[in-house]
Swiss-Prot record:
It is found in: Plastid, Chloroplast thylakoid membrane. HAMAP family: NDH1_NuoK (MF_01456). Belongs to the complex I subunit 4L family. This is NAD(P)H-quinone oxidoreductase subunit 4L, chloroplastic. The keyword Transmembrane applies. NDH is composed of at least 16 different subunits, 5 of which are encoded in the nucleus. Its main location: plastid. It comes from Panax ginseng. NDH shuttles electrons from NAD(P)H:plastoquinone, via FMN and iron-sulfur (Fe-S) centers, to quinones in the photosynthetic chain and possibly in a chloroplast respiratory chain. The immediate electron acceptor for the enzyme in this species is believed to be plastoquinone. Couples the redox reaction to proton translocation, and thus conserves the redox energy in a proton gradient. Keywords: Chloroplast, Membrane, NAD, NADP, Plastid, Plastoquinone, Quinone, Thylakoid, Translocase, Transmembrane, Transmembrane helix, Transport. The gene is ndhE. It holds the Pfam family Oxidored_q2.
């Protein structure tokens, strides 16, 4: 696969994730869009690592670290969303201003 094809795929994933993050009113959907953005970044890390120096695995190793951090971020984010839903009975972003109460 050529470099341009992978970069176009990554840019498409990033732009879909960014659009979803900006327009989403649901917290779970916003977390999913954030994961799309992080996966697009991981694709770029692996692609550039393979394209510029295929003998070293720096991009793949860094991508594994980003995946681990993204998994922790998703777990913490879903725990926060679950807690907000338990208290407010809503997971809409515009209804969860926690500074009011």
């Amino acid at each position: 696969m050529m470099l341009e094809h992978v970069l176009v795929l990554s840019a498409y994933l990033f732009s879909v994730g960014l659009y979803g993050l900006i327009t989403s009113r649901n917290m779970v959907r916003a977390l999913m869009c954030l994961e799309l953005i992080l996966n697009a970044v991981n694709i770029n890390f692996v692609t550039f690592s393979d394209f510029f120096d295929s003998r070293q695995l720096k991009g793949a190793i860094f991508s594994i670290f980003v995946i681990a951090i993204a998994a922790a971020e998703a777990a913490i984010g879903l725990a926060i969303v679950s807690s907000i839903y338990r208290n407010r009975k809503s997971i809409r972003i515009n209804q969860s201003n926690l500074l009011n109460k």
